[in-house]
UniProtKB/Swiss-Prot annotation:
Annotated region described as 8 X 22 AA approximate tandem repeats, given as residue ranges: 75-246
Region Specificity for association with VLDL, residue ranges: 269-281
Classification via Pfam families: Apolipoprotein
Gene behind this protein: APOE
Keyword Glycoprotein tagged: yes
Taxonomy of the source species: Eukaryota, Metazoa, Chordata, Craniata, Vertebrata
Subunit composition and interactions: Homotetramer. May interact with ABCA1; functionally associated with ABCA1 in the biogenesis of HDLs. May interact with APP/A4 amyloid-beta peptide; the interaction is extremely stable in vitro but its physiological significance is unclear. May interact with MAPT. May interact with MAP2. In the cerebrospinal fluid, interacts with secreted SORL1. Interacts with PMEL; this allows the loading of PMEL luminal fragment on ILVs to induce fibril nucleation.
Name this protein carries in UniProt: Apolipoprotein E
Signal sequence residues: 1-18
Binding site residues for heparin: L157, R158, K159, R160, G220, Q221, K222, V223, R224, G225, R226, L227
Ranges for region Lipid-binding and lipoprotein association: 205-281
Post-translational modification: APOE exists as multiple glycosylated and sialylated glycoforms within cells and in plasma. The extent of glycosylation and sialylation are tissue and context specific. Glycated in plasma VLDL.
GO CC annotations on file: chylomicron; extracellular exosome; high-density lipoprotein particle; low-density lipoprotein particle; multivesicular body, internal vesicle; very-low-density lipoprotein particle
Length: 308
């Protein structure tokens, strides 16, 4: 039980440190995606295309008004996911005598990381499609506000994309290392079992302490994997909430500006309505006073004399 609590504390502390390091990495994005495997090269092409879109040059603005950009991104997403799948299948072919439970866990974590990366890439394409619709609706008007919001969203999506791409890269490395380690462990176990049989005859049983150690290592890996998964999900949810709050703030500010403009327009309209009415009432009152004075024989320009 003490070992469990110690493992949890160490893992949580490591997670906190990883969050700090992650913010530093996101603040210092690399000039280009360092590509080694085919899937990384495909992702690099998506990455470079996104950087070009973020410039929001006149050429980009022109192509954003049609479906060319989103179609290009769709092809790049399909190419990247195809290469990731091919690389994963290549690793699976290299799997040696690995425990079924370990393989299932590693495969599940890898699929989750792959799904997050694909979702990030699709979010970029969806946001650009949304901008195209908004820009076409506001054609002929000032679109600086739309471009500002698009640039802000693309920066956030790019950070999330970088983080999840690095996570997928690490998961693939762990999967590859796990298969190699399992294969080496399987070959070593065969040698340990067959060696004494060939030299001495009887098979030697695996020491109980070794079995306990292997079980403890497997249990530790399982706990660490679950904690990493929970931490990643929590960070994703926090990012989503932060993005939603910023979008809500922008919408509230926009609606407040619209309400203020509508109130000013309504005030101007009310003034235009009531000014003629007030002027007409003043004219009618002056006419009434003049008639009363005329009926009483009082000249409007003559002041009444004082009685002695």
């Amino acid at each position: 039980m003490k070992f469990l609590w110690a493992a949890l504390v160490v893992t949580l502390l490591a997670g906190c440190q990883a969050d700090v390091e992650e913010e530093v990495k996101l603040g210092q994005e690399p000039d280009r995606w360092q590509a080694k495997q085919p899937w990384e090269q495909a992702l690099g092409r998506f990455w470079e295309y996104l950087r070009w879109v973020q410039t929001l040059s006149n050429k980009v603005k022109e192509e954003l008004l049609n479906s060319q950009v989103t179609e290009e991104l769709k092809l790049l997403i399909e190419e990247t996911m195809k290469e990731v799948k091919a690389y994963k299948e290549e690793l699976e072919k290299q799997v040696g005598p690995i425990a079924q439970e370990t393989q299932a866990r590693l495969s599940k974590e890898l699929q989750a990381a792959q799904a997050r990366l694909e979702s990030d890439m699709e979010d970029v394409r969806t946001r650009l499609a949304q901008y195209r619709s908004e820009a076409q609706a506001a054609l002929g008007q000032n679109t600086d506000d739309l471009q500002g919001r698009l640039a802000s969203h693309l920066r956030k999506l790019r950070k999330r994309l970088l983080r999840d791409a690095e996570d997928l890269q690490k998961r693939l490395a762990v999967y590859q290392a796990g298969t190699h380690e399992a294969a080496e462990r399987g070959v070593s176990a065969i040698h340990e079992r067959l060696g004494p049989l060939m030299m001495e005859g009887p098979l030697q049983a695996i020491p109980p302490s070794q079995q306990l150690r292997e079980r403890a290592e497997a249990w530790g890996q399982k706990v660490r994997g679950r904690l990493e998964s929970v931490g990643s999900q929590a960070r994703d949810r926090l990012d989503d909430v932060r993005d939603q709050m910023e979008e809500l703030k922008a919408k509230v500010e926009e609606q407040a500006s619209q309400v203020r403009l509508q109130a000013e327009a309504f005030q101007t309209r009310l003034k235009s309505w009531f000014e003629p009415l007030v002027q007409d009432m003043q004219r009618q009152w002056a006419s009434l006073v003049e008639k009363v004075q005329s009926s009483l024989g009082i000249s409007p320009s003559t002041k009444p004399s004082k009685t002695k």
